[in-house]
Amino acid sequence: MQLRTNVKHLQGTLMVPSDKSISHRSIMFGAISSGKTTITNFLRGEDCLSTLAAFRSLGVNIEDDGTTITVEGQGFAGLKKAKNTIDVGNSGTTIRLMLGILAGCPFETRLAGDASISKRPMNRVMLPLNQMGAECQGVQQTEFPPISIRGTQNLQPIDYTMPVASAQVKSAILFAALQAEGTSVVVEKEKTRDHTEEMIRQFGGTLEVDGKKIMLTGPQQLTGQNVVVPGDISSAAFFLVAGLVVPDSEILLKNVGLNQTRTGILDVIKNMGGSVTILNEDEANHSGDLLVKTSQLTATEIGGAIIPRLIDELPIIALLATQATGTTIIRDAEELKVKETNRIDAVAKELTILGADITPTDDGLIIHGPTSLHGGRVTSYGDHRIGMMLQIAALLVKEGTVELDKAEAVSVSYPAFFDDLERLSC
């Protein structure tokens, strides 16, 4: 696909796609709760539709009228053995969180996905779930999918210190803990996104959070709720960066989720001197509008506790750094290696093709800026965030064309991405 290049400026207002993390979890919580859950503004991207299909295969009645999704939950006990292997597609969230839910179901389930999922490590989830009493293993005697899990109705609580900062692992353990008799304790390596904890409370559950320690006493019965999904800051990030680096630009992004465990990119932009203003903030629902304007940027260092708050935004932050004055260092981001692709290598290789001065390290990137970008042939590696990052990079190309292989990957989280960009382009 030939990408849009040499854009003079970007102007306009966008409603970014609904939050992917909350959309996944809204289906999951609806399925394991008793009663009806209605979901408005659900993200109909490929990953979240994989979650919806997975729970239908477990016997959950889910209706979608195109506007609202209705989940008729019957609690954990209402989940039934799937007739076939559950296909999670490209979704790591689906497979890892479902393992936590299935840990308490007294039947065997097999989960598989695409080629990318088949390279994603699962021991980080399987080990604690096996400690709780589930029988979870790779079908091919490795830690990689396909995964087979046989749950038990006698799950034991766990006291677990996490070796990696992962909201997916934490969430899987919490889903299992909801079904275990007794108090489970999870200690995070670093604070990660807390949508699961918030939604446990929203659906009538209880847990205690003390810094990086989470305590949950089970078993608990949840009750169906009405969920309104805000816009996804991870999708907004591409247009935040575009608005900062394309000359004479001003973009208003409406109803963006502003959960503090997800807003690390806003802190980085501020540190780099970028102009992003929060308008119409709704503190109760953690959302607001974001107004971004073209800015002069300076380099920064990114590492430590902020990394889990922006892990998915690091590819587009790397592009931002190519347009900042000085040397930007990203460290402590080794988790990028086990995303849809090795994002450290992918970002470095593809931006180098376009003329960036960027070097991969074991746990991040070193980026010298500012640099002018030029045309070239690049690939998304089938990774939606790499694909969208490269299109934003192409906007800055003044000479030559940019050809993107595997552009269709963006539909995983943002099916209307190219259309939305076209509406803003001048």
UniProtKB/Swiss-Prot annotation:
- Keyword vocabulary terms for this entry: Amino-acid biosynthesis, Aromatic amino acid biosynthesis, Cytoplasm, Transferase
Q: Where does phosphoenolpyruvate bind?
A: 20, 92, 120, 168, 343, 385
What is the enzyme's main class? transferase
Question: Which reaction is this enzyme known to catalyze?
Answer: 3-phosphoshikimate + phosphoenolpyruvate = 5-O-(1-carboxyvinyl)-3-phosphoshikimate + phosphate
Q: Where does 3-phosphoshikimate bind?
A: 20-21, 25, 166, 168, 312, 339
Q: In which pathway does it act?
A: Metabolic intermediate biosynthesis; chorismate biosynthesis; chorismate from D-erythrose 4-phosphate and phosphoenolpyruvate: step 6/7
Write the Enzyme Commission number(s) for this entry: 2.5.1.19
Active site per database record? 312 (proton acceptor)
Q: Which SUPFAM superfamilies match?
A: EPT/RTPC-like
- Compartment list: Cytoplasm
GO cellular component labels: cytoplasm
Which superkingdom, per the lineage? Answer: Bacteria
Recorded GO molecular functions are:
3-phosphoshikimate 1-carboxyvinyltransferase activity
Q: What is its main location?
A: cytoplasm
Matches recorded under InterPro entries: Enolpyruvate_Tfrase_dom (IPR001986), Enolpyruvate_Tfrase_sf (IPR036968), EPSP_synthase (IPR006264), EPSP_synthase_CS (IPR023193), RNA3'P_cycl/enolpyr_Trfase_a/b (IPR013792)
Q: Name one GO biological process term.
A: chorismate biosynthetic process
Stated family: Belongs to the EPSP synthase family.
State the function annotated in the UniProt record.
Catalyzes the transfer of the enolpyruvyl moiety of phosphoenolpyruvate (PEP) to the 5-hydroxyl of shikimate-3-phosphate (S3P) to produce enolpyruvyl shikimate-3-phosphate and inorganic phosphate.
Write down the NCBIfam families for this protein, in alphabetical order: aroA (TIGR01356)
Which HAMAP family does the record match to this protein? Answer: EPSP_synth
How this chain assembles, per its entry, is: Monomer.
Protein name (Swiss-Prot/TrEMBL): 3-phosphoshikimate 1-carboxyvinyltransferase
Organism in which the protein naturally occurs: Enterococcus faecalis (strain ATCC 47077 / OG1RF)
**The organism's lineage?**
Bacteria, Bacillati, Bacillota, Bacilli, Lactobacillales
Identify the gene encoding this protein. aroA
